């Protein structure tokens, strides 16, 4: 701005000097020289105006570009969530590691039911979940091969010494097959995987829990609705090694997730059921997330009602309300 002001001051000084000289020529009766100076001043003035208009136009273009960039920064959340599910967002990480399931920390997790002797109904719950692409297109179908790891913990932070009441570990391997359906473009993929789940405990207190599943799932995105059904088959174990023989009775053979993905919030509903009318068991979970600071960190509310929230409680009915923060979806 200081340089512009000095330049304009110099221009005004030169213009005033030329104008004074033209007036002197008029007084002397030399109208020809006076007109030449007036013409020269007019050309200079028009040149300055053109330069100013070009400068204003350039500034306007820069401002519009800046606004466009800012608008592009806020992307459609529904496509971000789908990209995360399909593993398309890992290019932002040089190691190719990306989030898999929800990653959250819920310091306020209250159970309306007893959690056993000497356990506080109030605790913290958190989950870490990542995936890594290994390779792709071995079959010529544009398929992608992944390993993934999810850990969910229930932490008695309000008790003396703050022990971990339960931790579930879920390593898995899966293959994503893209679907190219001309008339059904909302069908995005077919996923086939094998999943191990364990609480990492020994048999000394009869608290060991583990099982293995083969599953198939797909993701269906229609406008801002995301639908993810998943079916599984439990890999059989011998009676000697099976430490939770009735787990299918409480967990069933499927779950479905239905989510509405707004611009800065999401609502997700998870349903699971054994489809037995005479002895029905299952679970429902409702997730609400709102991007408070517009930076990808969500205020997160989770409500669970049913069986199988954790392996240690898979055969116990629990109702829980939890809140905290979610950092990826």
Each language-model region and where it sits:
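A cross-kingdom marker for long, charged
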Residues: 38, 42, 298-300, 307-311, ...
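Cleavable N-terminal export/targeting peptides
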Residues: 1-80
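Basic/polar, acidic-poor N-terminal "presequence/leader" segments
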Residues: 52-122
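Outer-membrane beta-barrel "beta-signal"
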Residues: 318-329
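Carbohydrate-binding surfaces of carbohydrate-active enzymes
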Residues: 130
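Long, repeat-rich segments with strong aromatic
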Residues: 255-256, 260-302, 307
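Outer-membrane pore/translocation modules
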Residues: 25, 96-121, 135-263, 271, ...
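Gly/Thr-rich phosphate-binding loop signature of adenosyl cofactor/nucleotide-binding cores
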Residues: 126
């Amino acid at each position: 701005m200081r340089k512009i002001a000095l330049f304009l001051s110099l221009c005004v000084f030169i213009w005033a000097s030329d104008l004074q000289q033209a007036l002197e020529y008029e007084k002397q009766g030399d109208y020809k020289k006076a007109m030449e100076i007036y013409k020269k001043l007019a050309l200079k003035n028009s040149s300055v105006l053109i330069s100013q208009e070009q400068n204003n136009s350039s500034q306007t273009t820069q401002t519009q570009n800046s606004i466009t960039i800012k608008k592009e920064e806020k992307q459609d959340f529904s496509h971000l969530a789908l990209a995360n599910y399909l593993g398309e967002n890992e290019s932002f990480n040089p190691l190719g590691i990306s989030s898999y399931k929800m990653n959250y920390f819920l310091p306020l997790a209250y159970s309306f039911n007893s959690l056993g002797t000497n356990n506080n109904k109030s605790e913290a719950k958190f989950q870490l979940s990542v995936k890594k692409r290994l390779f792709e297109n071995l079959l010529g179908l544009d398929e992608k091969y992944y390993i993934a790891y999810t850990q969910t913990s229930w932490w008695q932070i309000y008790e003396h010494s703050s022990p971990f009441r339960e931790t579930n570990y879920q390593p898995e391997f899966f293959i994503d097959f893209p679907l190219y359906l001309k008339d059904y473009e909302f069908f995005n993929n077919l996923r086939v995987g094998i999943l191990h789940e364990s609480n990492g405990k020994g048999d000394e207190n009869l608290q060991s829990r583990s099982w293995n599943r083969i599953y198939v799932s797909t993701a269906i995105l229609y406008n801002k609705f995301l639908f993810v059904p998943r079916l599984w088959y439990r890999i059989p174990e011998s009676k000697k090694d099976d430490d939770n023989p009735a787990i299918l009775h409480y967990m069933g053979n499927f779950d479905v997730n239905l989510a509405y993905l707004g611009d800065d919030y999401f609502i997700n509903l998870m349903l699971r059921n054994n489809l037995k009318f005479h002895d029905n068991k299952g679970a429902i979970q409702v997730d609400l997330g709102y991007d408070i600071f517009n930076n990808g960190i969500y205020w997160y509310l989770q409500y669970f009602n049913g069986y199988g929230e954790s392996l240690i409680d898979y055969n116990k009915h629990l109702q829980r309300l939890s809140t905290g923060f979610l950092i990826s979806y």
